């Protein structure tokens, strides 16, 4: 994994060579996205057009096929601030940003990726090199006032010990899984486990200015106390809203669904 920049100064990450399963696993001391954005370079062609940085050079680490999943894992001690767009250059690939110290998305969005996972869990690969599990023991994921734009993606997954929505989250299919869990990314199984540190008061908290706007919304809140608290708007325009919670569900806002709750 090496860092370059486009002609206009936007950072370009030349992602690590993918393994046999097509997974590029990148480790960072810090991972932040400033408002101009960051490009994840999955390009094998000589010159590739990007929305954020114009024409960029191909990634020298990609001697064979491009990646189909790009994992960005933070191994340092600082939380991540995502304040701009993350663009995959070249062939589309799923994007995972994992930071156990926490993540704040405040004006973040994603380009040229079919599915995005933001998590405070540790990515675990199986024997074949595919992403098997996210191991969540700590960390909060916050959506700030400038929101999260997942409208270009088939799905957006937020997987953390606690999730706080202070802004709007837009997507086609949104899945929020909160609590200390081992979340199997291949089977969908969610297995509760002992977390680190204090238990958050609320697993999934949507403030008055926050909200989720998507075709289909699934919320899973595990842990003691309040599982899901909504003071904002949770609306599924095309499909259903599914809420599963170990704790209480408190709703002082609005939850609406085209088909069913």
Give the ranges of each region predicted by the language model.
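Extracellular beta-solenoid/beta-roll
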Residues: 249-251
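Solvent-exposed adhesion/ligand-recognition segments of exported proteins
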Residues: 1-237, 244-245
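Short, intrinsically disordered, charge-balanced linker/junction segments flanking boundaries
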Residues: 256-261
């Amino acid at each position: 994994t090496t860092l370059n920049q486009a002609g206009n100064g936007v950072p370009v990450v030349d992602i690590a060579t993918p393994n046999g399963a097509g997974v590029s696993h990148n480790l960072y001391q810090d991972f932040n996205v400033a408002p101009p954005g960051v490009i994840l370079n999955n390009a094998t062609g000589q010159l590739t057009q990007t929305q954020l940085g114009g024409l960029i050079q191909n990634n020298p680490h990609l001697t064979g096929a491009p990646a189909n999943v790009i994992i960005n894992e933070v191994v340092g001690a600082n939380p991540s601030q995502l304040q701009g767009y993350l663009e995959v250059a070249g062939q589309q690939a799923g994007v995972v940003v994992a930071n156990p110290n926490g993540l704040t998305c405040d004006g973040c969005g994603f380009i040229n990726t079919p599915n995005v996972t933001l998590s405070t869990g540790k990515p675990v690969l199986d024997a074949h090199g595919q992403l098997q599990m996210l191991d969540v023991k700590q960390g909060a994921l916050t959506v700030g006032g400038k929101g999260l734009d997942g409208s270009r993606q088939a799905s957006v997954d937020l997987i953390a010990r606690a999730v706080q929505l202070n802004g709007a989250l837009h997507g086609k299919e949104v899945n929020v899984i909160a609590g200390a869990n081992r979340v199997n990314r291949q089977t969908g199984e969610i297995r509760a486990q002992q977390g680190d540190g204090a238990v958050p008061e609320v697993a999934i908290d949507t403030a008055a200015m926050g909200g989720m706007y998507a075709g289909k919304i699934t919320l899973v809140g595990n842990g003691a106390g309040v599982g899901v608290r909504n003071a904002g708007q949770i609306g599924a325009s095309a499909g259903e809203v599914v809420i599963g919670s170990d704790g209480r569900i408190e709703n002082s806002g609005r939850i609406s669904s085209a088909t069913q709750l």
